[in-house]
Amino acid sequence: MLYLASRSLCRRQLLQRLDIPFQVIDLEIPEVRREDELPQDYVRRVAQEKAQVGLARVGDAFAPKVLGADTEVVLDGRVFGKPVDLAEAATMLAALSGRTHQVMTAVSLVAAGGVAAQVLVVSEVSFALLSQGQIARYVDSGEPMGKAGAYAIQGRGECFVSRLVGSYSGVMGLPLQQTAQLLATFEES
């Protein structure tokens, strides 16, 4: 049985596209970057922790596999997680305005017996120049809350994107091609 260790509705919807039966484990993992931890190491660690905590929660019944993922926006080495309030969301969007940033999504798959696999997908996203009015209207919509980097590419935030190189679904929170490949490889081993 496959489990998705995530509170993200978007990740649930994306995983459904793979037409693989799964159940959701709703858990909360502290997402705190360690001092001097590289952004890619941070997203890998958090994704792995989500999967491992999820596996511990379901136990060994029915040979479970648990999928965990984490997504962060990175600009000039600075990690933009989920904004804590509307003011921080506006600050993040102003920083991203007219710039190219990276969106890093790590996906970890673990199973009983310590078997594990992981993939990291890095996409480059360029934003158009945003006016203060555009930022204010978007922040007022509430959409930035709960989103890494304070935007949802699958929502109104897509209007800000002038260029994307990489995985659209990865920017959303679960890179489908790489996740499908990870699951297939895991089944073969």
Swiss-Prot record:
Gene Ontology molecular function: nucleoside triphosphate diphosphatase activity
Quote the catalytic residue positions. 70 (proton acceptor)
Q: Which family does it belong to?
A: Belongs to the Maf family.
Keywords, in A-Z order:
Cytoplasm, Hydrolase, Nucleotide metabolism
Against SUPFAM superfamilies, the record matches this protein to: ITPase-like
Q: Which domain of life is it from?
A: Bacteria
What Gene Ontology terms for biological process does this UniProt record contain?
A: nucleotide metabolic process
Q: Whose protein is this, by species?
A: Xylella fastidiosa (strain Temecula1 / ATCC 700964)
Give the matching PANTHER family.
Answer: BIFUNCTIONAL DTTP/UTP PYROPHOSPHATASE/METHYLTRANSFERASE PROTEIN-RELATED, BIFUNCTIONAL DTTP_UTP PYROPHOSPHATASE_METHYLTRANSFERASE PROTEIN-RELATED
Per the record, its GO cellular-component terms are: cytoplasm
The compartments listed are: Cytoplasm
Protein name as annotated: Nucleoside triphosphate pyrophosphatase
